[in-house]
């Protein structure tokens, strides 16, 4: 991309937001799986925008994108399960998962996320190649290696974007999960 003036900027920004795939030239990307049985999603930085508000008594509050829930329910109707897999220990993860109608496994040690993912797949008898993982931070990288397709939110850390098979146009907490759901639902039609 060569930006010489403001009109170039607007043109290329429109191109990116219209669905241009952002990739790392050194990474061999895998295609979206033909069959998807499960989407595993990180919580902070995917369902939320990675920010937290703390009041004077230490209670934490987050914000989530409500429209994610609508598309998650549609995925479940076509037989694709969704599970939140998070290192976050706060009960807000369970509360949001319940509202979304999905299972949440949270409080997972940062260095054990990949192991926990493998255990989920074993218990549910799901092949890794039929799993999509969406994340944003370096503790998600072991899950990226296991999943059949790894997806990064637009504002993920550079190492995560480099490792991803696909990078969304939406940032975490602002419709990233819905964008992924839309992409998968469109493919399954």
Spell out what each predicted region is:
Residues 10-13, 73-76, 118, 178-182:
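Predominant activation on well-ordered alpha-helical scaffold segments within soluble catalytic domains
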Residues 2-6, 66, 163:
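Alpha-helical architecture
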Residues 58-65, 92, 98-100, 104-107, ...:
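Mg2+-dependent phosphoryl-transfer enzymes with acidic/Ser/Thr/Gly-rich catalytic loops
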Residues 7-10, 70-73, 115, 139-142:
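Active-site phosphate/pyrophosphate-handling residues
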Residues 26-115:
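Alpha-helical substrate-recognition element adjacent to the catalytic core
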Residues 1-31:
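Conserved alpha/beta core of the MobA/IspD/sugar-nucleotide pyrophosphorylase nucleotidyltransferase superfamily
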Residues 4, 42, 135-136:
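Acidic di-acidic motifs
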């Amino acid at each position: 991309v060569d930006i010489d003036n403001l009109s170039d900027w607007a043109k290329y920004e429109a191109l990116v937001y219209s669905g241009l795939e952002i990739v790392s030239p050194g990474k061999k990307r895998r295609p979206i799986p033909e069959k998807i049985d499960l989407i595993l999603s990180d919580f902070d930085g995917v369902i939320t925008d990675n920010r937290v508000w703390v009041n004077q008594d230490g209670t934490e509050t987050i914000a989530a994108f409500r429209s994610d829930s609508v598309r998650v329910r549609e995925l479940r109707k076509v037989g694709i399960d969704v599970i939140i897999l998070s290192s976050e220990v706060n009960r807000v993860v369970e509360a949001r998962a319940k509202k979304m109608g999905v299972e949440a496994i949270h409080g997972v040690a940062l260095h054990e996320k990949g192991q926990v993912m493998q255990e989920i797949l074993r218990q549910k008898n799901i092949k890794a190649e039929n799993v999509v993982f969406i994340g944003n931070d370096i503790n998600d990288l072991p899950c990226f290696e296991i999943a059949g397709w790894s997806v990064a939110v637009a504002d993920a850390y550079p190492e995560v974007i480099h490792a991803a098979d696909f990078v969304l146009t939406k940032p975490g907490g602002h419709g990233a999960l819905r964008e992924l759901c839309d992409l998968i639902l469109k493919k399954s039609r």
